[in-house]
Amino acid sequence: MKLLASTVLVGAAAASITPQQQVLQNPFKSATKPVSDAWSKSMESLGHLTGSMKGMTAEAKAIWDEVSMLFPEAMEKAAFFSEPKPHTRKPDSTWDYIVKGADIQSVWVENSKGEKEREIDGKLEQYNLRAKKVDPSKLGVDTVKQYSGYLDDEEDDKHLFYWFFESRNDPKNDPVVLWLNGGPGCSSLTGLFLELGPSSIDKNLKLHNNPYSWNANASVIFLDQPVNVGYSYSGSSVSNTVAAGKDVYALLTLFFKQFPEYAKQDFHIAGESYAGHYIPVFTSEILSHKKRNINLKSVLIGNGLTDGLTQYEHYRPMACGDGGWPAVLGASECQAMDNALPRCQSLIQNCYDSESVWSCVPASIYCNNAMMGPYQRTGQNVYDVRGKCEDTSNLCYSALGWISEFLNKADVQKELGVEVSSYDSCNFDINRNFLFQGDWMKPFHRLVPGILEQIPVLIYAGDADFICNWLGNQAWTDALEWPGKKDFNAAKTKDLQLESGHKTGTFKSSGNFTFARIFGAGHMVPMDQPEASLDFLNKWLNDYTL
């Protein structure tokens, strides 16, 4: 669903935005124990990673010291891996389709030089894909053809759940879109029912048709990833974006092999929030395979976290009235954020330079506390500056609880072929694991220039979001170093509008790069502005212009 507000490292579900979350009141100002004691204890609990200390500065070491002193219980729980979800694997005979990666790898063809080579690139032998036909009349989510199932990594005991909806229009010719929610650790099925899918769910668990569903003119795959998110499960774990990318490439390859009727259409990846990390990595992984059956044409990132060094500078302006909405914070809090920014940027730069867990984790901890903490303590919704957080047990949105109730119904799980015992919209252990692997602050924006050389990229942002705000997204797209930077920065901003002439935002575009600001939308643009989001999606899928 969204970027979880992990403002501290967290010993439990502190990645959520509940009042009980331990946000440092004065980040890293005081110490009550000798540094050597703190360092010794933190190293004892994290000793299995001492080989990764390359690039760690004294400043980063000091952050680890201070965190271990302030939150000793959190350090003890920094295990980096989530607990396996209870599950029962169904016999192969219960599935309508099974495609084996080993069978794909066994197909060899002759190239133009007369040499033998594999028809499709990639290490796929350990993967299988299971699929079943979903009876639309059983669930009532949509009337279109649907498939659900799992991608299985038999070697590492990982099982990713997906749910596919055909286009409502012309599935034989309409494009296919993979949708990814963020977190990290939030299920893409929340995107299905809360934002852009065929139906929404009310408090009585009744379904309501969404006339602005993104499958109006495209087939859509909703994927629960990484493992142990949503209906996905594993005996092992994934705690970094790069590892997750291998799984996504395998899923798409096997899916399009099983269902070749969708493989010839244009394919696009879209997502929001932490998908600002996922999508550059997943896209680069796909594009690295020259012999593939994935017809990737473009990517879309909504309110993403992609370049922390640039984006974190814009938390203070967004919270203090410079983002087009009234200020949430007072002058003293705004000044404190300004004062903390140089240290935050220094830590992030060190992370960028070394990409070491020992440098990237302190950057995340310090900057999240200093830049998100003051806003979070007000009780305002971090996903929408226009209001308070109304339901702290469900990341401010009660509908998340309704979605979880619906997806925990036995008849729903049976029809979808679900193999886990329960569904949660977000797995906070996954969020913690990615944080402790240093994944949060890594410079994945550096992959974007290589992507732009091959396919178009759309960065869009609802302008009422705080946590991945439009100011920061606009700034990193302007700052990105790529051959088209000069022309992109000089491009004129144009109005984004519906056919009726109603203005829904602004955008600028040059070459393969487009940035769009969506008016009156928070973190989840399709939820807040459903008509506008479907309109710009259809325009983009048609010819990559808005």
Swiss-Prot record:
Subcellular location: Vacuole
Glycosylation sites recorded in the entry for this protein: N217, N512
Name by which UniProt lists this protein: Carboxypeptidase Y homolog A
Pfam families documented for this protein: Carbpep_Y_N, Peptidase_S10
InterPro entries: AB_hydrolase_fold, Peptidase_S10, Propeptide_carboxypepY, Ser_caboxypep_his_AS, Ser_caboxypep_ser_AS
Coiled coil: none
Organism: Botryotinia fuckeliana (strain B05.10) (Noble rot fungus)
Propiece span(s): 18-132
Disulfide bonds listed in the record: C186-C426, C320-C334, C344-C367, C351-C360, C389-C396
Keyword Secreted: no
